[in-house]
Amino acid sequence: MALSLTNKNVVFVAGLGGIGLDTTKELLKRDLKNLVILDRIDNPVVIAELKTINPKVTVTFIPYDVTVPITETKKLLKTIFDKLKTVDILINGAGILDDHQIERTIAVNYTGLVNTTTAILDFWDKRKGGPGGIICNIGSVTGFNAIYQVPVYSGTKAAVVNFTSSLAKLAPITGVTAYTVNPGITRTTLVHKFNSWLDVEPQVAEKLLAHPTQSSQACGENFVKAIELNQNGAIWKLDRGTLEAIQWSKHWDSGI
């Protein structure tokens, strides 16, 4: 069911960098009620700029590192819910691309996303009297087919796709819907220089950028279109300036 973002309260994890920042700018054109940006690094200049895009929207920045214990995330979310009373959408966008940092890549790209999602279920889960909500998780096309020189990063993104697809199937129980947006190669600082696993390909960034890419602005525009389409369980591919729903092939079924 299509979703109007007018007067919605949105929490955006990692909404200040790369794809996140251009998506934030696009969201602000939609007359949200509140946009709460949770990010590890404060950038007052950018926050001030964002506040001028649409004075109707209240933009709030709160420092947040997705690798903190889940108890800390729950405390932070409680302060947000106490202030706003309700949150309509959670966007999980934290991510790093550096296969030298194996544990941190998993912690930021996957564990942090799972913990933030699990924490907000305390407030949304209809079994606890919650109103439900919408989760938008940022994956990557590498979650479909890996960039094999960065298997750790690619593996975390495959995990995000599977985790989110499971959340979508649990919506009748929890009242919380979910989908992934999966950008292709996008011209951001993330891909300009990064390390391959065990240095198997020292020129991996240069070789990747030799292929067709997209701007973060084009990606952000399609990102918001996907949010407005609001399809539970969707696996969106945002590549080369296009938006496409992926039909996932089923090769096995648990039968439960």
From Swiss-Prot:
Q: Which UniProt keywords apply?
A: NAD, Oxidoreductase
Question: What does the record give as the reaction this protein catalyses?
Answer: a primary alcohol + NAD(+) = an aldehyde + NADH + H(+); a secondary alcohol + NAD(+) = a ketone + NADH + H(+)
Q: Which gene encodes it?
A: Adh
What are the record's GO terms for cellular component? cytosol
Stated family: Belongs to the short-chain dehydrogenases/reductases (SDR) family.
Organism in which the protein naturally occurs: Drosophila ananassae
Coiled coil spans: none
Positions of substrate binding:
S140
According to the UniProt entry, what is the EC number of this protein? Answer: 1.1.1.1
Annotated binding of NAD(+), by residue: 12-41
Please describe the quaternary structure of this protein: Homodimer.
Q: What is the lineage of its organism?
A: Eukaryota, Metazoa, Ecdysozoa, Arthropoda, Hexapoda
**PANTHER family the record matches:** ALCOHOL DEHYDROGENASE
Q: What is this protein called?
A: Alcohol dehydrogenase
A biological process (GO) of this protein is: alcohol catabolic process
In this protein, the active site sits at Y153
GO MF terms listed in the record are: alcohol dehydrogenase (NAD+) activity; aldehyde dehydrogenase (NAD+) activity; protein homodimerization activity
